[in-house]
C-alpha cells in the first residue's frame, strides 16, 4: 500500500513539474539584443518585452524570434513600418464594397391583383 501511495505521489509531482516547465518554455526571454538590422520583408510581427531587459521581439515569417534594442533607430523604423502595414491590412478587411444592382425599369402596364 505504501509503495502504491509513493508511486502516485511521484506521478503527480512529475505531472506538476512538467506542466510548469511547459509554461516557462513558451515565454521568450531575451539574453542578448541583436544590433544587426533585419530586413523588414522578413518580419511578420513583433511584441514589446518589458522587464529586466527591455526588448522588441521580432517574429520572422519563418517563426524565428529575434530580440532587438527598442531604442535603436532601425528597430523604431521597423515597428513604424509594421504598424502602418497592419493598419492598412486591417482597413482593407474592414471596408465593405457596395455593388449597385440594376432596378427593373417600370413599364406603363397596370397590374391588378384580385383576392
Swiss-Prot record:
GO terms for biological process: antimicrobial humoral immune response mediated by antimicrobial peptide; chemokine-mediated signaling pathway; positive regulation of cell migration. The keyword Glycoprotein applies. SUPFAM superfamilies: Interleukin 8-like chemokines (SSF54117). The keyword Signal applies. It holds the Pfam family IL8. Disulfide bonds join 30-67. Residues 1-19 form the signal peptide. GO terms for molecular function: CCR chemokine receptor binding; chemokine activity. Interacts with host XCR1. Chemoattractant for CD4-dendritic cells, but not for CD4+ dendritic cells, T-cells or B-cells. This is Viral Lymphotactin. It comes from Rat cytomegalovirus (isolate England) (RCMV-E).
